[in-house]
Amino acid sequence: MYMYHMNIGYPLLTENSEFYINSYEVVPRDEEAKKGLAQWNQMIPPTPNFAEQCFYHHYHTDLAKMMVYNKDIEKGIQICFDTKEFPQNLQWKMMGERDYVLGLEPCTADLDGRHTIKKNSEILTLEPAESKDFSVNVHLFNDKSQWESAK
């Protein structure tokens, strides 16, 4: 499995940040994430004893877009990737009092363990001396109009 794990934190990430992903379906990874499914895209204030929530995103498009924008500082970020290269995408939401972060993770398989990945025939393998190129594009925004036009 190959994965990019990009953490977004303060000052870009606050309870006033907007979050957008162009997925058609959001699937909770576990029981804890099911509790937060209705608020998967809402940032909240740092919360004592917050339990992490992870969500898988599925796409109907070849280009995935994950975006965070903070209107208070007029800054934002967009992470784009080809959904054929990265057929899975995990959103890690941790709104804890000391651990306040949003992890955005394009990956080649889900994170439910090698045994499950092999069973579902999702594992990417390379032969000896074989290579594969992957790309993820990151764009930074300086105002709301850039954010809106990037959606």
Which ranges hold each PLM region?
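Active-site-proximal structural scaffolding
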Residues: 1-2, 61, 97
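Hydrophobic residues positioned within well-ordered beta-strands of beta-sheet architectures
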Residues: 2-4, 64-66, 102, 134-136
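HotDog/MaoC-like acyl-thioester-processing domains
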Residues: 1-16, 146-151
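Sparse, context-dependent recognition of short Cys/His-centered cofactor- or disulfide-binding micro-motifs
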Residues: 4, 51-53, 64, 87-89, ...
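Active-site pocket scaffolds in enzymes
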Residues: 73-151
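Short intrinsically disordered coil segments
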Residues: 4, 21-24, 34, 119-122, ...
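Active-site/ligand-binding surface loops and adjacent short beta/alpha elements
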Residues: 7-81
